Amino acid sequence: MENQKVPISSVPNLKDLDMISRPIANFPPSVWGDRFINYACEDENEQAQKERQVEELKEQVRRELAAAIDKPLQQLNIIDATQRLGIAYHFENEIEESLKHIYLHTYVENTCFEGSDDLCSVALWFRLLRQDGYRVSCDVFKKFRDSEGNFKNSLMEDAKGLLELYEATHLSVNGEEMLDDALEFTKTHLELVVSHLNYPLAEQVRHALYQPQHKGLPRLEAVYFFRIYEAYDSHNEALLKLAKLDFNLLQSLHMKELSHMAKWWKSLDFATKFPFARDRLVEGYFWILGVYFEPQYSLARKIIIKVFTMISTIDDIYDAYGTLDELKLFTKAIQRWDIGSLDQLPEYMKPCYKSVLDVYNEIEEEMDNQGSLFRMHYAKEEMKKIVEGYMDEAKWCHEKYVPTFQEYMSVALVTAGYTFLTTISYLGMGEIASKEAFDWLFSHPPIIEASESVGRLMDDMRSHEFEQERGHVASGIECYMKQYGVTEEEAHDKFHKRLVKAWKDINEGCLRPYPVPKPLLMRILSLTRVIDVIYKNEDWYTHVKKPMKDKIASLLIDPMIV
């Protein structure tokens, strides 16, 4: 990136300069235009008919779960299918009771169940119980190892078992060397056998090797799993039909929400007022669908997407346009949190600052109506913290200062934005988002630090080359290379190891007993999953290429054929 001379008219309060040198990033424009502004509502009669079908099918699934009360493996398979098809939220109580029953009888009481000597069944049992927070031991896999402690060679012929064990290993916590070995073993052998497998198992293996289920977005994974599940003769027709109908009903809701947000975003005219910033409303909404897609979180989505667009624009003001003096003024204005600070800002900054206050005032009114006004203190404090972090990074960039890796991370974990986004994600979640829950979050527990680490490390690994080309602050990669005298490849390897540990910390943080209600923990896990998906190969939020467009289209454009 080159510093570009920008006419002073863009900042009319600095009349003593003829031109200002600015670090323009030349971000690509939105690829969507006004694609999502207009939404044609479905015929009410048709929607009502679909909703009736959904209710009937839900009752059928409930009956099937209840009928399998003494058949743990059958229950596990039904639960797994509901989760993979994206409809588990309809059966939270039933699934909770079923898994509790299975845990007590098969683990606490050590009662054998059908398939307890089968790798695929045991791995499924382990994964589903771990996903639900149960501290089941990985010692259950000892029976599949030989006298020397290696996994038996005979397992190489069990592709389904290897796949299920591979998926289970991604729920490991620190100290579980057996699962570390299992991951290496299964990954190696699945890569060897995948070309010899038939559809749909071959497709399942390829997909899992690219995107493990535990790190994927449930809504996105459901789109992929529909065709896989349908291809198996053993699929449950009621489950499949329910999932497709429910997907389309939810898609209509999401499109309606996005249309509303698109009109709001267009009315702000940020694309014109901040042409240097990323215009990413649609990508932001996709991000938020990864945090929660369920209908009961509609208000929460509307809150967080507005704040998300604000912080994305602020990030780019600090990162790709503002001068150091201008940024100091904006930082002070955020700390004061007062409309009276507007007059102290450069002209181009005023629409952003005013919009931030307007968005927060709108949220504050909603919180007041709910009797939850206390939440706004946390939301404002997090905004102040992240803007302070942006300011620190801007100073480093201006001074061409390369901090130590530890100094860098002390700021970069904040600017990764994941404590900020987690805080905002709690605002619309109802009574479970108590003052105690926010205090817990602000105590910076290990799970939130791990989530921040994943966000920061993956961002740096995928975007540092583009950012260094445009004169960005030194990324974690550069800081690590300089401090430890290693190559870029070695730095990436160290970052990968840190990512592995961070995911284990997240898994540990999701185990019982829960420090806060489980749905609040799930927001942290879900936000981390979004990073794994969007930054898996490169920064698809900034550079919206075909893979990202296809993902968005699958959730927000293309309906399921029922």
Swiss-Prot record:
Motif (DDXXD motif): 315-319
Obligatory cofactor(s): Mg(2+); Mn(2+)
Annotated positions binding Mg(2+) 1: 315, 319
Assigned EC number: 4.2.3.-
Amino-acid positions noted as binding Mg(2+) 3 in the UniProt annotation, renumbered to this chain: 467
UniProt keywords, alphabetically: Lyase, Magnesium, Manganese, Metal-binding
Pfam families linked: Terpene_synth (PF01397), Terpene_synth_C (PF03936)
Function, as annotated: Catalyzes the formation of beta-elemol, guaiol and bulnesol.
Designated name of the protein: Sesquiterpene synthase
Lineage: Eukaryota, Viridiplantae, Streptophyta, Embryophyta, Tracheophyta
